[in-house]
């Protein structure tokens, strides 16, 4: 499993809904939260979509990540491409996108096979108190935060449906 040795602790959204519903309503409009978890990342996550992480037949909406704590710099990187598959695969076209040297440094943990199938990386720096939002079908990943001074990063992640 690609998640290990990172940690996730899922819990019932009802425990925080009173405080978070108004924030989410302002950001993404009407929604249902179907996934709610705290996450500690100690290794960078590879390119994936969150489409498959859906417990019901509703259409996946957004992933909302709230950075909670980190000991250095970190980014979430969201790509132009979307998929209902978990990872880029042979069914995804090769994009021939030319990544910058900065991009390649941030994406140093990603195998070339996957990089060939994504383009136009949007690099979103983690800032405590901010929220990072993307459609769950979009391919995304963490940056290769271990190349800097960052040893861990903690977040609250919510998955929504329409």
Segments the model singles out, each with a brief description of its role:
Residues 1-47, 82:
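Non-heme Fe(II)/2-oxoglutarate
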Residues 42-138, 143-162:
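Catalytic core of non-heme Fe(II) oxygenases with the double-stranded beta-helix
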């Amino acid at each position: 499993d690609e998640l290990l040795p990172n940690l996730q602790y899922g819990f019932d959204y009802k425990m925080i809904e009173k405080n978070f519903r108004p924030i989410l309503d302002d950001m993404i409009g009407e929604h249902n939260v179907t996934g709610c978890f705290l996450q500690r990342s100690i290794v960078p996550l590879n390119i994936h979509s969150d489409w498959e992480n859906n417990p019901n037949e509703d259409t996946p909406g957004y992933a909302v990540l709230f950075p909670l704590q980190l000991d250095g710099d970190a980014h979430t990187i969201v790509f132009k491409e979307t998929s209902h598959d978990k990872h880029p695969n042979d069914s995804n076209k090769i994009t021939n996108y030319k990544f910058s040297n900065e991009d390649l440094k941030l994406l140093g943990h990603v195998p070339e096979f996957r990089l060939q199938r994504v383009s136009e990386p949007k690099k979103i720096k983690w800032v405590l108190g901010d929220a990072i939002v993307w459609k769950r079908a979009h391919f995304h990943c963490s940056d290769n935060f271990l190349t800097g001074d960052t040893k861990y990063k903690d977040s609250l992640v919510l998955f929504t449906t329409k």
